[in-house]
Amino acid sequence: MTPLAIRKKRMKRCDYYMSMYPAESGIDAYKDTEKYPPGYVKFLMYGGDAKTIPGHIRIFNKVGDAYGFLTDAAYIVDFKNDIEFILSATIYTNENQTFNDDNYEYDEIGLPFLRNLGQAIYEVELERRREHKPDLSRFRFPDRDN
């Protein structure tokens, strides 16, 4: 078997877009930060609605929602504290057990749970001793990161 071969330039581009906040996309509709705040698709750590996210934190992720399931798979980087971790979670929030009725408890149960889970793991990572300091330079983008 051969390893996944992705050119560095393409990988950098993928990293760039996976960590982008809505207003950074260049798409006019996403410039409305009231409707699309920085945490809009950052379920872990921010529950999908953070008005501000510290400049030293970047979340490279992919989210999904369907039929009461909420999912976020994220690589979370904190440049100021030199920490990184991967976290993935899925929660089911379909209390009435009826699929495709658009009646799910995303806001009441799912997003707060994912936010709290991400923040709890982040707090553990802040305290965890590391034998080796991570090299996070690959994940810095001078045009937008502090």
Regions found by a protein language model. Give the residues of each.
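Structured C-terminal helix/loop/strand segments within mature extracytoplasmic catalytic/sensor domains
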Residues: 1-146
